[in-house]
Amino acid sequence: MDTLHLLCFIIFLALPLRLTSKQYSGGFNEDYDGPFEVQETDEEDEFDEFLNLPNWESGGRKKDVSNVEAFGAIGDGVSDDTKAFVGAWEKACSKRGNSIFLVPKGKRYLVSANKFKGPCAGQLVIQIDGTIVAPDDPKIWDPDHPRMWLGYYNLSNVFFQGKGAIDGSGSKWWAASCKRNKSNPCIGAPTALTIDSSSRVRVRDLTVKNGQQMHFTIAWSETVRVSGVTVLAPGNSPNTDGIHVTSSKNVVLQNCVIGAGWHLALRFIMLIFELKGNQMLFCIMVCVLIFR
């Protein structure tokens, strides 16, 4: 079966287009001179201002870096790095001002199902440059989290970015699905990435792939912009929704590439776009289907 991709982008009317460079710098745990550089357009800046999204580079201030390896992460794809991720999260989330939760590039970090909860003390960048992988065996999945893998809850002023990947290791889940084999019981499977009960969030340039079921869910959240995100799964992977948005308002998807198996690429439920002053958020979503 061919893999279907859906390329989506938003056109904003009457906004200038000019590239600027934003640079992030490190501090906590190490002097990190890493890839905290973001190419943004004035269009994006103006839209962020319109939605009251935070100014990440304000004043060129230093950011404190919480590197998961400083908390014991191995990154061999076999050792359980969950405790290291939790420790780095607790440190980054507790820092006032600007802080960075860093997943370094070049390694695969095995992380079990976990809820990363806020509120955090300051603005937070979640920099994913390596690959986060899920346990691949449904039989050993944490029974306390049957429908989620990486969950982010009750956050505000958070920026997810990086050239890394979130890999749900979903092949055994697909094989056990009743969609694949009608003799199998029909049971739910985890969502790879969930942002829930959060506001003023940006997600940029990440890859989410091989989701156990849904890849990326935004729920009960407000003022979220997702841009440059890639969602990938094999064409025969069952019920692997690409991006699922529910019970949320002011959510924008921009320049996303979605090839999410045989189920829905995008799903929107109970979305609300609000008036701000005498302005109304007006956008045009353009989708292009790509087969490969």
Regions found by a protein language model. Give the residues of each.
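Extracellular/periplasmic carbohydrate-active domains that bind, remodel
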Residues: D2-R292
